[in-house]
Amino acid sequence: MSTGFFGDIQKVKYEGPDSTNPLAFRHYQPDEIVMGKRMEDHLRFAVAYWHTFTWPGGDPFGGQTFLRPWFEDTMKAAKLKADVAFEFFSLLGSPYYCFHDADVRPEGKTFAENTKNLNEIVDYFAEKQAATGTKLLWGTANLFSHRRYMSGAATNPDPDVFAFAAATVKTCIDATQKLGGENYVLWGGREGYETLLNTDIGRELDQLGRFLNLVVEYKHKIGYKGTILIEPKPQEPTKHQYDYDVATVYGFLKKHGLENEVKLNIEQGHAILAGHSFEHELALANALGIFGSIDMNRNDYQSGWDTDQFPNNVPEMALAYYHVLAGGGFKTGGTNFDSKLRRQSLDPADLLIGHIGGMDCCARGLKAAAKMIEDKALSQPLADRYAGWESAEAQKLFRGEYSLDEITHYVESHDVNPQPRSGKQELLENVVNRYV
């Protein structure tokens, strides 16, 4: 049954690249076969509950611009928001959604009230999922908005805050499991510091390690089959966050023996904030065996902060999905649109238009990436570049069968004098442009 929020808008359909209908897909066809697999199953799109239905449109210099009928902190409003959300998922044809606990339930005065409210809305979501076929990609706990978390959650100097946060995560894992969520995400928005003058880094990192171990232990205790994901971000809201980037998180996981238990949810905008390209973070996560899922958005390259805009750069998407496909594709992860409307985009249709554009952009990127893989457009030049390491002697060198003295003797006795070879960067950049 329609809520009426979207007026007479009908389910979004594919109309082809020549369509000028803003409420139609031009490139995204769920059933199109790409590399032997349905496009929908490659991309595994999800809608972010928080930016799409909870964000009021504020910024540091101005307050709310969106006037949504569910913007009240009551269970009645929470259920109306759920009605609109699941109608939106159906109109868009998104197979998945994601949420924080605070996005979906009213804020209670106590932990017990929060748990009661979450359980009630989870039961409501379960009915909605059954009726629409929409699934939960991942759930998570908001451990950053409430004032109790102003000094962190897991890294807070107050052990009672640590305990409250841990108990909250338990309820959110339970909710995620009940709804069939395929992943559970941890994002440390306040797990960092503003100044070292009042911060014991060593203690806070140890607290964070204990917290993450508790999560993994509980996952196994209850038999949750989903993947635990960490989402890196270098700063904002804190000056420096401990989950800075892929490399930093990997070192943290290794220290605590969790590199085989936890994978990463990598956001394009966060990669940019860390001074990396999106494809760098994806390639590194693949190389380290910790790639899990992605949050798809973009930042304004001039502003210097996290603007969470919908993706619109096909070459960037092509390179991103190239690394996703090259690593074997998503297992339990997917493409979550952690993107929000601009605060002047007031119309309900704008919510659909933003997602449609993002989905079309990702579809174009996926198809370009798949074609590059099928043609070995990048993999063959890469293999040629490193071909010298395939020789028997080079393999022994790589496996550590020669000492430094033996290597030196080889260089001297064979008069080794290697000459540099072209890296062909311009050629490869031109190759990519042929596909996009």
Swiss-Prot record:
GO cellular component: cytoplasm
EC number(s) recorded for this UniProt protein: 5.3.1.5
Residues given in the record as Mg(2+) 1 binding sites: E231, E267, D295, D338
SUPFAM superfamilies for this protein: Xylose isomerase-like (SSF51658)
Active-site feature positions: H100, D103
Keyword annotations: Carbohydrate metabolism, Cytoplasm, Isomerase, Magnesium, Metal-binding, Xylose metabolism
Binding site for Mg(2+) 2: E267, H270, D306, D308
Predominant location category: cytoplasm
InterPro entries per the UniProt record, alphabetical: Xyl_isomerase-like_sf, Xylose_isom_bac, Xylose_isomerase
One record GO biological process: D-xylose metabolic process
Cofactor dependence: Mg(2+)
Cofactor comment text: Binds 2 magnesium ions per subunit.
Enzyme class (EC, first level): isomerase
Family classification: Belongs to the xylose isomerase family.
Subunit structure: Homotetramer.
Protein name: Xylose isomerase
